[in-house]
Amino acid sequence: MPAQGSQRSXLGSLNSTLMATPSLGLAANQSGPQCLEVSVPDGLFLCLGLVSLVENMLVVAAIAKNRNLHSPMYCFICCLALSDLLVSISNVLETAVMLLLEAGALAVGATVVQQLDNVIDVLICSSMVSSLCFLGAIAMDRYISIFYALRYHSIVTLSRAQWATAAVWAASILSSTLFIAYYDRTVVLLCLVVFFLAMLVLMAVLYAHMLTQACQHVQGITRLHKRQHLVQQGFGLKGAATLTILLGVFLLCWGPFFLHLTLIAVCPQHPTCSCVFKNFKLFLALIICNAIVDPLIYAFRSQELRKTLKEVLLFSW
């Protein structure tokens, strides 16, 4: 990747998967289909990253402070927060470096820029892969806690959770390094897309099965009550809404980015696909939004964690 390209890319080597796609660089007024290009100001991009950064730092600090939260479930939640933290740090860092280079406030050689670009790319990709893995791990942990409740503490031990998280981090770093090294190979892009779809299917199946089991449990409890139908209907709607939020946020925030990768592999030269490529920075912003939403869904719903978070905030003041 040329030095100038590395200074301007929104995601370094990942964005340079499109180097072979001339249409990506088309201006909005050039020939081709009418494209909807959503501009994400650098200021907004940085603000989203900083909000996510602070939010996930608080989650990590709260879990580290409270020994009652040193359990397998919170181990996965903490690692998810760390992954989202790295997503935010890497994107904010790259955007800040890019702005400084464009403003001429940072004078470094092309070789240094290239090396920095590669390091940030590996950091971004590994944090994305690990974030997806820990979302799947949280779903599996909840599934085991429901369907194997009596054996849960013997199946999901803290040591096993720690080994699993170490394996996820190692696999994420290795896979992201290979991805950056072979970003121009179609099979690499397709592997990432298949991985995303596998995580989506895994989460959908596990959470749907948990919802079905919960509805059956409520049905058994309310069988003798007069307002059985209303209770079942209310619980079913609440469960369906929760499932929709979980999978909807996941698909909305991650789906466009992996659609982007799919189109690079399938139709890199097609004018319609080039319209999607123009919104690459928007897709990154959505991933950062996911890093903001994750603590709200998985961490802050815990009363114990919220209590510890208040203590952390009061202590910091």
From Swiss-Prot:
Q: Which SUPFAM superfamilies match?
A: Family A G protein-coupled receptor-like (SSF81321)
Which parts pass through the membrane? 38-63, 73-93, 119-140, 164-183, 192-211, 241-266, 280-300
What domain of life?
Answer: Eukaryota
Glycosylation sites (chain numbering): 15, 29
Q: Which Pfam families match?
A: 7tm_1 (PF00001)
Per the record, what ranges lie on the membrane's Extracellular side? 1-37, 94-118, 184-191, 267-279
What Gene3D superfamilies does its record include?
A: Rhodopsin 7-helix transmembrane proteins (1.20.1070.10)
The Gene Ontology biological process annotation of the record reads: adenylate cyclase-activating G protein-coupled receptor signaling pathway
Example of a GO cellular component annotation carried by this entry: plasma membrane
Subcellular location per UniProt equals: Cell membrane
Q: Which residues lie on this side of the membrane: Cytoplasmic?
A: 64-72, 141-163, 212-240, 301-317
- The primary location reported for this protein is membrane
Its placement in the membrane is given as:
Multi-pass membrane protein
In the record, what terms sit under GO molecular function?
melanocyte-stimulating hormone receptor activity
Per UniProt, the keywords (alphabetical) are: Cell membrane, G-protein coupled receptor, Glycoprotein, Membrane, Receptor, Transducer, Transmembrane, Transmembrane helix
Q: How does it assemble?
A: Interacts with MGRN1, but does not undergo MGRN1-mediated ubiquitination; this interaction competes with GNAS-binding and thus inhibits agonist-induced cAMP production. Interacts with OPN3; the interaction results in a decrease in MC1R-mediated cAMP signaling and ultimately a decrease in melanin production in melanocytes.
This chain's function reads:
Receptor for MSH (alpha, beta and gamma) and ACTH. The activity of this receptor is mediated by G proteins which activate adenylate cyclase. Mediates melanogenesis, the production of eumelanin (black/brown) and phaeomelanin (red/yellow), via regulation of cAMP signaling in melanocytes.
What the record says about family reads: Belongs to the G-protein coupled receptor 1 family.
The protein's name is Melanocyte-stimulating hormone receptor
At the highest ranks, the source species' classification is: Eukaryota, Metazoa, Chordata, Craniata, Vertebrata
